[in-house]
């Protein structure tokens, strides 16, 4: 990963990273890195789901759903925050205001017109992605 290349191998001068990776890099190598966070960023929330067919075949439907529900519990949100993942629970996020910038303006996909608009504008042939990479 890019984080590994910079942090462990010393390759590169600047890294754009997930928030938690930046915090972990600073924690693992105090004084070696500086985090410069933008005032505006994109709220990226990778999806989590139970894959019904797989869970049914393995007989793990109940425990899978319990785990999924637990991820959003107060206890799990605190564990996430302690590992530098931004909690989705606002009250718990505020408990970790010494770690997370509560004033950062976080944009969602809706702020960019939704997935269909983003796909068309940025990733379709001739879109922003192609122009950046000279395609």
Task: For each feature predicted by the language model, list its residue ranges.
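Sec/Tat-exported extracytoplasmic proteins
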Residues: 7, 19, 25-29, 52, ...
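Extracellular/periplasmic juxtamembrane helices and adjacent flexible linkers that interface
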Residues: 55-135
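Solvent-exposed, acidic/flexible segments
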Residues: 8, 15, 38-41, 57-64, ...
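Extracytoplasmic/secreted envelope proteins and their assembly/folding machinery
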Residues: 3-4, 19, 45, 64-68, ...
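Ligand-binding pocket segment of bilobal, Venus flytrap-like solute-binding proteins
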Residues: 1-38
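A near-ubiquitous, low-amplitude feature marking generic local secondary-structure context
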Residues: 5-8, 31, 50, 63, ...
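Periplasmic-binding protein-like
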Residues: 29-61
